[in-house]
């Protein structure tokens, strides 16, 4: 079992049980107690749990403190579920934009599995790897500065390059969404990228799993009135739907 799979099983177990002993985690993942200790140390450093004598307790860390690798396994099933709904909005032959973020990776995998003739513009290096391996699409990568921690390109040059293209559909993964502030992001260097993709796109689809709603991050991206469609998973907090509808935003979730 690879490390990320072990991390996911540990986090899901702690979400359900709140605590776990070293031996319980060792049995869960089929590894030694020494391996468990190393895994718990990394997860604690990422803010996902707190180590205690003989085990660990769950800690629901703020997403701004989580590393990209940890974010990539958090709510993975929800992300995979929601991207299945993109099929109603993307047509083969279109030009599509994908921004940085872990949900964008799942979106890229969905596109690779279901389409043949897309042109994809992305500043997400992880998405680029998915697309390059598939060898199916025309892929456009804007220039700029690389953020190695996020695996994403940013900067004025990146934003200018994006604005050179006419994008049919921008698929925009977001990190926080509230009625008070709209879309916000903890990644200061990515807000301008999202804005550029919005400006260049005819259709804007925001993708966010259920954990992103009711949160506010430090950087403003756009208001609710600038949104058209949100895709979320089956655990979407339904108490948010009436307000989105009243403000002209469609919320698409699995039936």
State where each predicted segment sits.
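Short glycine-enriched loops at secondary-structure junctions
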Residues: 55, 126-127
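Conserved phosphate- and dinucleotide-binding cores of soluble alpha/beta proteins
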Residues: 2-12, 19-25, 30, 78, ...
């Amino acid at each position: 079992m690879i490390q990320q799979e072990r991390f996911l099983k540990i986090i899901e177990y702690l979400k359900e049980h709140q605590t776990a002993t070293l031996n319980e985690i060792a049995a869960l993942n089929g590894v030694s107690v020494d391996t468990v200790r190393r895994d718990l140390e990394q997860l604690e450093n990422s803010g996902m749990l707190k180590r205690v004598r003989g085990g660990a307790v769950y800690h629901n860390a703020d997403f701004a403190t989580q590393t990209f690798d940890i974010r990539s396994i958090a709510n993975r099933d929800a992300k995979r579920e929601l991207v299945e709904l993109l099929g109603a909005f993307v047509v083969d032959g279109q030009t599509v934009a994908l921004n940085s973020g872990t949900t964008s990776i799942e979106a890229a995998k969905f596109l690779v599995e279901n389409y043949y003739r897309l042109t994809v513009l992305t500043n997400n290096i992880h998405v680029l790897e998915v697309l390059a391996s598939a060898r199916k699409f025309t892929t456009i990568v804007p220039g700029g500065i690389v953020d190695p921690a996020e695996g994403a390109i940013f900067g004025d040059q990146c934003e200018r390059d994006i604005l050179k293209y006419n994008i049919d559909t921008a698929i925009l993964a977001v990190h926080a969404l509230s009625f008070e502030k709209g879309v916000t992001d903890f990644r200061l260097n990515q807000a301008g990228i999202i804005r550029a993709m919005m400006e260049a796109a005819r259709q804007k689809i925001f993708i966010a799993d259920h954990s992103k709603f009711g949160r506010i991050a430090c950087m403003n991206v756009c208001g609710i009135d600038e949104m058209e469609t949100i895709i979320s998973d089956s655990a979407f907090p339904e108490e948010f739907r009436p307000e989105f509808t009243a403000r002209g935003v469609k919320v698409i979730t699995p039936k």
